[in-house]
Amino acid sequence: MDKKIENDSSIVIASDTSDSGNGKSKIRLMKDKLLLSCVEGNVSVGAFEIIYIETMGHRNIVHLKDQDFHIYEKLDTFEQLLRAHGFLRVHKSYLVNMQHIRNINSYVMTLDNGVKVSVPKARYKEVKREYADLK
């Protein structure tokens, strides 16, 4: 197994993906860290580092400040694991870390990295309420 450690945060990458594709979950939560079996290799990421997760095609993209990771796992699985860590499903394709929301206005959420996420009209009140409760 090749290991690569990036000390600029708590991201650890190990390029052994021997357990991928065996039907087991590709995500594990240990305290406040996610252990992911990604396309890029096995990755350990602090939940607080994740800005948002988006579904694109059959994979999810875990967006951090300076890095993205691709993983074949249901967004529902991420939602169940991260709900207690301040994550909110704002759209069928987006799970957002509420600590990284800059503002919500006119059905658009702006995140710390400048990304704008549309909030469906049906979910807007709930999203605004959840965000207000966090503040």
Describe these PLM feature segments:
Residues 7-112, 116:
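Conserved binding/recognition cores within well-folded domains
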Residues 78, 126-127:
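DNA major-groove recognition helices of helix-turn-helix
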Residues 4:
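Membrane-interface aromatic/basic loop that binds lipid-linked glycans or pyrophosphate carriers
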